[in-house]
């Protein structure tokens, strides 16, 4: 089974968490694209979706799924999204696709976070994947210096502007042994919009695409 086939297995398995008549929180990325395709097969059974990115919104609309604004929804039953890394405590690094802030907002209003990944994303310690930080442009240099003080090696993600009009710093060479503490420290830096650590709001369910098919941990 290829990596993409494992992603597809995880994405389609997430359909079991979608309630009839509900509005579904939808994340961003290659694994989520498979979930969106799966969602298209039951579009008449759901009310619609709240999307975490422009890219996902476009894909949902192409399939005829109504997309609601986050401000118009009080809560969501389920949010389905991928991760760049996930540890045994279901804490994650997200934001490889630069949608981390909107992903965090949609996760915050959701009762259940279903994380869909292939089996290359599971790690013992977070940090091998560069940690994305969304930053207001005028604060880029200051935030980079502060991230160095925390032991990281930040790199400006050239040519990327987030859906919110901000920039991304990717922090390399971090071993994040206490993700909740690191999330708080980075979020406390002036000019940081948010960091791609999902530790305080981790996953409730993890669906992993493996060569044998989808493995579900609740």
UniProtKB/Swiss-Prot annotation:
Entries under InterPro entries matching the protein: NagB/RpiA_transferase-like, Ribose5P_isomerase_typA_subgr, Ribose5P_isomerase_type_A
Record key words, sorted: Isomerase
Pfam family name, one: Rib_5-P_isom_A
SUPFAM superfamilies reported in the protein's UniProt record: D-ribose-5-phosphate isomerase (RpiA), lid domain, NagB/RpiA/CoA transferase-like
Keyword Isomerase attached: yes
Catalytically driven reaction(s): aldehydo-D-ribose 5-phosphate = D-ribulose 5-phosphate
GO cellular component, one term: cytosol
GO molecular function annotations of the record: ribose-5-phosphate isomerase activity
Enzyme Commission no: 5.3.1.6
PANTHER family: RIBOSE-5-PHOSPHATE ISOMERASE
Family assignment from sequence similarity: Belongs to the ribose 5-phosphate isomerase family.
Function as written in the Swiss-Prot or TrEMBL entry: Catalyzes the reversible conversion of ribose-5-phosphate to ribulose 5-phosphate.
Subunit and interaction comment: Homodimer.
Protein name: Ribose-5-phosphate isomerase A
Source organism per UniProt: Vibrio parahaemolyticus serotype O3:K6 (strain RIMD 2210633)
């Amino acid at each position: 089974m290829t990596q993409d086939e494992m992603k597809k297995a995880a994405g389609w398995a997430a359909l079991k968490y979608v309630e009839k008549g509900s509005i579904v929180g939808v994340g961003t990325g290659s694994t989520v694209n498979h979930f969106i395709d799966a969602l298209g097969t039951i579009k008449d059974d759901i009310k619609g979706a709240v999307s975490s990115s422009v890219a996902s919104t476009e894909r949902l609309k192409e399939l005829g799924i109504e997309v609601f604004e986050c401000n118009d929804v009080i809560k969501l039953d389920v949010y389905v999204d991928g991760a760049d890394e996930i540890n045994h405590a279901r804490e994650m690094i997200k934001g490889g696709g630069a949608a981390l802030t909107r992903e965090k907002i949609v996760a915050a209003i959701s009762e259940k976070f279903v994380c869909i990944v292939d089996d290359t994303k599971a790690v013992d310690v977070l940090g091998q994947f560069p940690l994305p930080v969304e930053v207001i442009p005028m604060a880029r240099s200051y935030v980079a210096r502060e991230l160095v003080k925390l032991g990281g090696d930040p790199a400006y993600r050239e040519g990327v502007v987030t859906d919110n009009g901000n920039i991304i710093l990717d922090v390399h060479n971090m071993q994040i042994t206490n993700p909740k503490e690191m999330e708080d420290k980075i979020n406390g830096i002036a000019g940081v919009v948010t960091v791609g650590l999902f530790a305080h709001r981790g996953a409730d369910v993890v669906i992993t695409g493996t060569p044998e098919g989808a493995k579900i941990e609740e």
